[in-house]
């Protein structure tokens, strides 16, 4: 077996790993890198058309965001994911593609004015629609035979890992010719314990090799806060002042948790003097996501949420909930003076309808802006949390007079205690642990802790290649060890998206040529003539 790390190695985003085993090439996750690059990215060593299968741990864009790019560049094989992950990818990938198209359109307007060549989006909405035909949804806990031939057998099983609706760790049982079966587990993102709605992370049982995330491998979340009590206090204070509670929220996962909290607040009558206060969700993506949550309750909800469903209650709905679908609905929210809760995306305030709600509410001292998720450096959300007195929205200065608060403790990722508990629940120690999906220092810290506990562990680099056999791993290529640093020198020009696609098509053509070996001479000659004609046309 050979394992190649192509993303999220000593970084948090862009998860992508290549496995070559039993005569087949598999990709596990195909995520988009978000934020700043820390290490130089590596080119995929194989053309998308040569991949035999793709497996996804969950639907977050940093794990699935390049799936339509694979399709655009020739991949037509199966994509295995849980039912809920498949449903969420159906909306998240189209949303990502829409953003890609908008960014390309904006860049091309600038390029046209400066006389530069136009750029193509990494993929289009149509690519995102088309790739969904390749998905083959799977249930939790069932073994699936991916390949079974002379070179060996590969089976897969998905285990709920409690990070997001449909999230899973993936166990691959690999039997190569003449060898005993070995188990390779990809943890995916391991969920935080005792979070609302979805189940706690489950252990897949055993592994010979483990690829394990380390997002919070150097810290603890501390005691679990009483989210509902804290949210009630903030809401009561805001409504008493006659203001709106504006909540920037991620459309998938966090918004549904908030609806769960507000249902409890209303059901228990925790707010006094404001009966029937409205809660408005102003995000088309959040609306679609909430529908998917409701449709997947039987597989993914925890006991508490499932008990509500079985008693005839909807855990994500309550009197006074309004879903805003159209732009007209969104505009009307701020013309209505009734004090209310407004939940809108994006969670870091850098895009989406939330910016309009901030424009109308930030300057009002009776209002509150409540952050319920991580705010990255450089985002408007971080700027507000750090105490800015004025911000710019749509080119205009807006005074910050509203109260700015943060709901502490909400996280979809396990802390170091949660990671350790998950690992220690394996029936035996994995022979080797690869630590990924963590910032450089964090991944190294977690790998060192595992080594101190007696595990063979390492934090690979992007491009790192390892041979696996007999429970041991041997590094045969280290990968990119040099960190990217800013330079005062002019950066080298980057290849255009169109040129990158051309390169990918060239690799696809080579893959077809390789597969044509042994074909009929007549067909091969015709194929060669067609390629020669194409070369003659474009040779300069």
What is each PLM-predicted segment?
Residues 392-423:
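Generic long, charged, amphipathic alpha-helical segments
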Residues 463-526:
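Charged, amphipathic alpha-helical linkers/stalks
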Residues 152-158, 292-300, 420-421, 470-481:
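Short, surface-exposed amphipathic charged segments that create phosphate/polyanion-binding patches used
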Residues 52, 208, 340, 367, ...:
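Conserved acidic residues
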Residues 190, 223-228, 317-329, 348-350, ...:
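A general structural motif
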Residues 234-379, 392, 427, 442-444, ...:
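Hard-cation-handling environments
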Residues 196-211, 297-305, 375-401:
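Short, compositionally biased "basic patch" segments
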Residues 1-55, 60, 64, 71-257, ...:
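His/Asp/Glu-rich metal-coordinating catalytic cores
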